Amino acid sequence: MVILAALCLSPLLSYGSSATSGYSEGNDSQTDGNVRLIVTTDLGGSDPDDIQSMIHLLVCSDRIDIEGLISSEAWVDDPDKTEKLRQTVEHFIEVLPTLRIHSSGYPSAEYLQSIVAQGQDKPHMDGVGEGKDSPGSDLIVDAIREDDGRPLWVAAWGGMNTVAQALHKLKSTEAEEVFRKYISRLRIYDILGQDDAGAYIAKNYPELVYIRNKEVYGWAPNDQWTKENIQNKLPLGAHYPNRIWATEGDSPSFLYVYSNGLNDPEHPEYGGWGGRFSKDRIRNIRGMDFIERSGKSETVFDDYYMIGSAPEGNQSIKRWEQSIYNDFAARMIWTQEKYYDKANHHPVAAYNGDRGRKPVYLYANPGDTVILSASGSYDPDNDDLEYFWSLYEEPSDYEGNVIFDDARGRDCQIIVPERVGDDGIHIILEVTDKGSPKLTSYRRIIIKNIK
């Protein structure tokens, strides 16, 4: 039996842009499918990697709907660092007019200024409780209450206690049924675990989707590449600091929700630029040892369960690293280039004419021939395109062989192997232009058995 490239989009929520988000919409920006994101960050502390990640995030803000940038504590009782966060945002705002030449999806300066807030003023769970609301925790509460239709992701680059305070307030002020509805909207991506509040949240709100990534290093570019492609792109690049330890340790959290057609954030086990994660929750994933050094312990919340890294660890990010580098480099060129036609822009990867970004589900029987087509793909700069179809082995579940008859053709076909499990066969279409730097867009096709 021959299965044509029929289209069945993901049955999950249809995510659109909020009318009050401060983001504009345009065909060039492809804002459909953007994810809501709030970041809590200890930017301004001893490690400058939060500033690095913040600049990277902001130049990607046409593909992510940022709803809050919150200055938070980690394990150290630091002075308020909100002003340093505001300064970083202001440096980005300087280049916003130029960026908007290249993508209309960027937020306005006024909007970005309005979503910077101070979080808890004490670290750990010491900063959580009655009468301890902060502008940051109130911002999170308001975002959770907003009936947007999309999940709300929180990326924790520092501590989690501002999120814990928001949940404390909701639980103490809302009826149980309403509270459960609210927290069903929330998702957390925790970098390393930097205070005891993460374990508290996982213990007390076990229904929350809570990812803790301990495999955030080893994918970032070297210092020379960073200097040439990021820091030398003035004026914004001048504010991208040299590393002290690792580069951009927090970036996997927003790369996970970056809308490029590769990942589905609602399925941590699928994998993408921000890593791949376990399908089942793991018991007592410990945070950084700084928690215990500061006199706290996550063991008081045992047993708690979180979603952890998949067995391949940081390789789940490294496999995409060149495309991540090129994407960042192109965006830094956008910050300088005042003429659209003098910069490179992302191709649009289409599957059988569909130009969305959600996964495509196909249903077939063992032995069927499935015809795959990237028809409808195009490049806004009229660059030639390269196509590459590949099997994403790790999230797939099958027995037998998956062979592409023309893996580098616009169209190709495979024969469904003898057994396909419940997780299906994950095929990744990469569409790469021949501009400089080369940019890649994706589609994910998941083949499952006809039940």
Language-model region placement:
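Bacterial N-terminal signal peptides
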Residues: 2-14
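C-terminal edge beta-strand
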Residues: 440-450
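Short, solvent-exposed loop/turn segments at the edges of extracellular beta-sandwich modules
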Residues: 432-438
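Broad gene-expression machinery/nucleic-acid interaction feature
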Residues: 426
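Compositionally biased regions
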Residues: 11, 15-22, 442
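N-terminal acidic, glycine/proline-rich low-complexity segments
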Residues: 18-402, 411-415, 419-422
